[in-house]
Swiss-Prot record:
GO terms for biological process: proteolysis. Glycans are attached at N101, N328, N378, N422. InterPro entries: AB_hydrolase_fold, Peptidase_S10. Involved in the biosynthesis of sinapoylated anthocyanins. SUPFAM superfamilies: alpha/beta-Hydrolases. It comes from Arabidopsis thaliana (Mouse-ear cress). It holds the Pfam family Peptidase_S10. This is Serine carboxypeptidase-like 10. GO terms for cellular component: extracellular region. Residues 1-21 form the signal peptide. In cv. Pna-10, this protein SCP10 and the adjacent SCP8 are not present due to a natural 13-kb deletion. Expressed in senescent leaves. The keyword Signal applies. Belongs to the peptidase S10 family.
Length: 437
């Protein structure tokens, strides 16, 4: 009898270990009343033993969830939680910037959410970011391993939500996800050819200020800085003449170039590289004490996500996560995709649509760098450079290519959509519905 009971308990433990959790969230601390949208959170187990547990937030479209596109949103980093994308960039709720007094930070409903026209899965990846965790040590993650894990996540998530198999599917994200998203699109596309009875209805992808070939793209920071009047004409001409376009991995024997690059950094070190017009108040922690700093919101999101009531509302499994961080920079990680340009080329050949947008006040990933790799794909222009408008005002500039790739700048935007979420939302809404920007 004792042996039978022991075996039953072991079987129960195995079943519990392999059950993926999902729960509907009716309300959130900091927001009054019931949620005006449908939110589901949960974990999907990854790997043979499903030791990796990837946490997600799923928000149904507020328009027509049965037919509207399904998006997967990935934040950058690597190691940044997609809760940041939800609360800062394109979700239906956002954090109020107010002095933290020890109580839970407040939320408000937004008018710019992408969920007004799409279903969105916000995924915490790689494992170790956000509320995702592993039951056992997994060693170092990498770009390529994460691509396979995210693909597995999608297959399992859709098998549990089969009503979304037929929805047009897009992979979306910004910043470092520029390395992951194109490779993931290729992985899904290949998977559709070799498997299964239910195919992912892959249509394309969306990327904002994407890192694509980091070591090469950094060289565009100096031309960008000159164009924005952060350095003088004389310094710029000397840099071009003596560095020959290579400003990052400078040969130490080229002493003239070394000295000139040092002069450049003296001019720009106190500039906020994410958005050159916003005070760089986060590096010394000034934002922690004053909501006058834009990045005070980064402090507030950590206060909110580490509140026990919030974790209970989100159905985070107790004991699986210590301190929640907006970005976990300590995850062991191998950046083993050197350039995602070949993936863009492959995805273009396979006919997938893409929207690539750039906030034009971002030094981290200058729009000139993005234009350069798009040009290197060597596709013809079908709709040449022109302004795109909102309420008869120029919101940015756009160009469309024969590979179904649309490039757009967001005038006054920064490294992510959070700086101008309304403009970014209108741009996305037009593109996803097939309208010209």
């Amino acid at each position: 009898m004792g042996s039978t009971l022991k075996h039953l308990l072991l079987l129960l433990l195995v079943l519990i270990r392999h059950v993926d959790s999902a729960a509907i969230v009716k309300s959130l601390p900091g927001l009054e009343g019931r949620l005006p949208f449908e939110l589901e959170t949960g974990y999907i187990g990854i790997g043979e033993e499903e030791d990796i547990q990837l946490f997600y937030y799923f928000i149904k479209s507020e328009n027509n969830p049965k037919e509207d596109p399904l998006l997967l949103w990935l934040d950058g980093g690597p190691g940044c939680s997609s809760l940041g994308g939800l609360l800062f960039e394109n979700g239906p709720v956002a954090l109020k910037s107010a002095v933290y007094n020890g109580s839970n930070p407040s939320l408000f409903s937004t008018t710019y959410s992408w969920t007004k026209m799409a279903n969105i899965i916000y995924l915490d990846q790689p494992v170790g970011s956000g509320f995702s965790y592993s039951r056992t040590p997994i060693g170092k993650s990498s770009d390529t391993s994460e691509v396979k894990r995210i693909h597995e996540f999608l297959q399992k998530w859709l098998s549990k939500h089969p009503q979304f198999f037929s929805n047009p599917f897009y992979v979306t994200g910004d910043s470092y996800s520029g390395m992951i998203v194109p490779a993931l699109v290729q992985e899904i596309s290949k998977g559709n050819y070799i498997c299964c009875k239910h195919l992912i209805n892959l249509q394309g992808y969306v990327l904002g200020n994407p890192i694509t070939y980091a070591e090469h793209e950094k060289n565009y920071r100096i031309p960008f800085s000159h164009g924005m009047s952060l350095i003088s004409d004389e310094l710029y001409e000397s840099l071009k003449r003596n560095c020959k376009g290579n400003y990052e991995n400078v040969d130490p024997r080229n002493t003239k170039c070394v000295r000139l690059v040092e002069e450049y950094h003296k001019c720009t070190d106190k500039i906020n590289t994410q958005h050159i017009l916003i005070p760089d108040c986060d590096k010394k922690g000034h934002g922690i004490t004053s909501p006058d700093c834009y990045y005070y919101l980064y402090f507030l999101i950590e206060c909110w996500a580490n509140n026990e009531r919030v974790r209970e509302a989100l159905h985070v499994t107790k004991g699986t996560k210590g301190q929640w961080q907006r970005c976990n920079w300590t995850i062991p990680y191998d950046n083993n995709i050197i350039s995602s340009v070949p993936y863009h080329m492959d995805n273009s050949i396979n006919g997938y649509r893409s929207l690539i947008y750039s906030g034009d006040h971002d030094i981290t990933m200058p729009f000139q760098a993005t234009q350069a790799w798009i040009k290197s794909l060597n596709y013809s222009i079908v709709d040449d450079w022109r302004p795109w408008m909102i309420n008869d005002q120029i919101a940015g500039y756009t160009r469309t290519y024969s590979n179904k790739m649309t490039f757009a700048t967001v005038k006054g935007g920064g490294h992510t959509a959070e700086y101008l979420p309304n403009e970014s939302s209108i741009m996305f809404q037009r593109w996803i519905s097939g309208q010209p920007l």
